[in-house]
Amino acid sequence: MSTAAAVRPTRATSVGAAVDALRAHGLRVTNPRRVLLDALYAAEQPQTAEALAGDADVASVYRNLDAFESVGLVRHLHLGHGPGRYALRERGAWAACEACGRHASLPAAAVTRLRLLVREATGLDAGFDHFPILGLCPECANVH
């Protein structure tokens, strides 16, 4: 597990708030970082670094994503098979279909209830930040 999983999430509901958060953590806000923030806030689904990069250098995008993750703005997650993806931490947990790969964000209230159930059953304070809750979507469940 990465050390970023232990980082407290930074609440930033806009690019401007994210810029302020980066500066508050002593990070410079360069034009490539601002462009990357714009892409993250525009994305409705978690994105690969390659998709976020566009015409930018992918290695630079990875370095900037690591910086964003270190201050709690972004998280790296795996949604089933395929490359890792990045999403804003405040966008919550995800569920993914093991058969077709479709994924959806989970409502915060549902995740809170799930965490309580896991804690009651096991004593474990479960986190759903890095991996999705896996299952079959309705279409794939009908096929299998």
Residue ranges and their predicted role:
Residues 3, 40-41, 54:
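Long C-terminal interaction/binding lobes of large macromolecular proteins
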Residues 25-27, 41-44:
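Short helix-capping/hinge SLiMs at alpha-helix to coil transitions
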Residues 33-43:
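Positively charged, polyanion-binding regions of nucleic-acid-associated proteins
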Residues 57-58:
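Short coil turns linking two alpha-helices in DNA-binding domains
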